[in-house]
Regions:
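Residue-level signature of mid-helix packing/kink "hotspots" within the transmembrane helices
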Residues: 29, 57-65, 147-148, 258-266, ...
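Extracytoplasmic gate region of multi-pass secondary transporters
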Residues: 31-32, 210-262
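Conserved MFS/SLC helix-loop-helix module at the cytosolic interface between two early adjacent transmembrane helices
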Residues: 62-98, 272-275
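Cytoplasmic helix-loop-helix junction between adjacent transmembrane helices
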Residues: 106-143
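Helix-loop-helix hairpin linking two adjacent transmembrane segments in secondary transporters
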Residues: 139-186
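Symmetry-related core transmembrane helices of the 12-TM Major Facilitator Superfamily/SLC fold
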Residues: 165-182, 368-386
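C-terminal transmembrane helical hairpin of 12-TM major facilitator-type secondary transporters
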Residues: 275-321
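A late C-terminal transmembrane helix in Major Facilitator Superfamily
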Residues: 328, 332-364
Length: 402
């Protein structure tokens, strides 16, 4: 108990929160890559063993509001320490599983602890009012790199061991990093309590319209992001015949698109610190409408470059909504609003595969999916139109800390 009192109300440099974001996405994808090997151990096929991971992803979203509530009641820094040790110990428990029920329970436990990061870690990040957009962009890149690194790292571990090694190594690393994170916690020089003492206790003017616009862009953007990250590798396999018909090559090209586009978040984050988010969100939406539609029409090299630009606009949207939140929502409410936003994102993401499956099974070609996503991007354009323009005096992230 004394140890947790010692870390309550503290903060940590951005780099450590960014690495935590990397680990959050990485740990959630360990099973995705190790599932086939685990299935062989338990005598199950890939499609059968994958069911063990469903609970983890459901809890990953569903427990976010609970994590936000606990952080508001106790301490964000304490919850973040629990996050690292929790995902680490849960991963080790997964490695010790002797039945698929034990494995499912352990993966569910990973999901529970992994749910802490987005409502709590992001809220810690935006406590500081310095260059919020840019810092959110950098943080987003770390999360994307966690997604990209998981298949590579787990693939290497599988060449020297089995699925148990994948969970053990990942869990031990998370615990070791959790100790580093805890040691790097420092006193918050601008605690939320001091901001509240200056009157920053309510939402900024126009917050209803701003959160409505954020909800529209989150829902439509979440579906587009989920669908694009799922269908692009397969679309490249069938639509780049002049470049390659190799699954390995087209997969590499898809990875290049994702990796390059993810860095757009930094540029958009830098821009949103200087330009009203209304116009940035509007422009990102227009870019998605145009270039996602072009991706449905092109093949080969034209498709590759159109898809690269389209994904830049898709990834570029990520830091915008959290920046909007920091300007309209007081610190005391941010974790709760972030948790709801994250849960909506996951719910929308869960609908991607069934909806895409129904469309393709109905006889439509894959290009029709991109036409659908281009149409959905109109909602992002509309969200940009609805988003109010704030004066500096109205922005909550510009209020004095003391």
């Amino acid at each position: 108990m004394h140890a947790f009192k010692a870390i309550n109300g503290k903060t940590v440099p951005d780099l450590y929160l960014n690495i935590s974001h990397f680990l959050d996405h990485f740990i959630m994808l360990v099973f995705a890559k190790a599932a086939y090997d685990a299935g062989r151990y338990f005598g199950l096929g890939y499609e059968e063993i994958m069911v063990c991971g469903v609970g983890g992803f459901v809890l990953f979203g569903g427990m976010a509001p609970v994590a936000a509530h606990l952080a508001d009641r106790f301490s964000r820094s304490a919850l973040m320490v629990i996050f690292h040790f929790g995902i680490g110990l849960a991963a080790i428990l997964a490695a010790m599983a002797q039945s698929i029920w034990q494995l499912s329970a352990a993966i569910g436990l990973i999901g529970i602890f992994a749910a802490i990061y987005h409502p709590v870690g992001i809220a810690m990040l935006i406590q500081s009012n310095q260059r919020i957009g840019f810092r959110l962009g950098v943080n987003g890149v770390f999360g994307n790199m966690g997604v990209a690194a998981a298949p590579l790292v787990i693939g290497v571990l599988l060449t020297v061991g089995d699925w148990r090694l994948c969970f053990v190594a990942s869990g031990l690393f998370c615990i070791a990093y959790g100790m580093v994170f805890m040691l790097r916690l420092v006193e918050d020089s601008a605690p939320a309590a001091k901001k509240a003492a200056k009157g920053v206790t309510g939402f900024a003017p126009g917050w209803q319209m701003a959160l409505g616009a954020m909800l529209m862009s989150t829902a439509s953007g979440g579906f587009i992001f989920g669908a694009m990250t799922f269908v692009v590798p397969r679309y490249f396999e069938i639509s780049l015949p002049a470049i390659s018909t190799s699954v390995a090559v087209t997969g590499l090209l898809a990875s290049i698109v994702y990796a390059a586009a993810s860095f757009t978040q930094i540029g958009v984050g830098w821009l949103i610190d200087r330009v009203p988010p209304k116009w940035v969100l509007f422009s990102v939406g227009v870019g998605q409408v145009i270039f996602v539609a072009l991706a449905a029409s092109f093949t080969d090299y034209a498709l590759f470059f159109a898809m690269l630009v389209a994904m830049c606009f898709v990834f570029g949207q990520i830091p915008i909504t959290d920046t909007i939140l920091s300007r309209y929502v007081p610190d005391s409410w941010r974790a709760r609003v972030l948790s709801v936003k994250f849960m909506i994102n996951l719910m929308i993401g869960a609908s991607v595969l069934p909806i895409c499956g129904v469309i393709l099974q109905s006889g439509y070609e894959m290009a029709a999916l991109f036409s659908l996503m281009s149409g959905l991007a109109v909602m992002i354009v509309l969200a940009g139109i609805l988003l109010p323009v704030q004066s500096d005096a109205q922005r909550l992230d510009r209020q004095p800390a003391e």
